Swiss-Prot record:
Family statement: Belongs to the YbaB/EbfC family.
Protein's name in the database: Nucleoid-associated protein Sfri_2406
Pfam family, any one: YbaB_DNA_bd
HAMAP family: DNA_YbaB_EbfC
Primary localization class, coarse: cytoplasm
Role according to the record: Binds to DNA and alters its conformation. May be involved in regulation of gene expression, nucleoid organization and DNA protection.
Keyword annotations of the record: Cytoplasm, DNA-binding
GO molecular function, a single term: DNA binding
Protein's cellular compartments: Cytoplasm, Nucleoid
Amino acid sequence: MFGGKGGMGNLMKQAQMMQDKMAKVQEEIARTEMTGEAGAGLVKVTMTGNHNVRKVEIDPSLMEDDKEMLEDLIAAACNDAARRIEENQKTKMAEVTGGMQLPPGMKMPF
């Protein structure tokens, strides 16, 4: 079933190697920072791979404008940064899993 003697042990070894690689990639993802933008770059939000906002940059010209518009742009920049983080995570995990797809709704890291 597992290719004879040592087959199961070899399978377990491969699973452990993959788990180790995934742990390293997850650490790398957590350290990664992505910047999302809104309003043609007037609002920028930098977020870590753990979805923690590290920095918000607002162009001074927006300080005179409508408060609601500024709030909308900040939210849009946060969403853009989160989307970029998700795309980066998918790419990094696909490298580890050899493109093996996760079931719908299952996110990395577990």
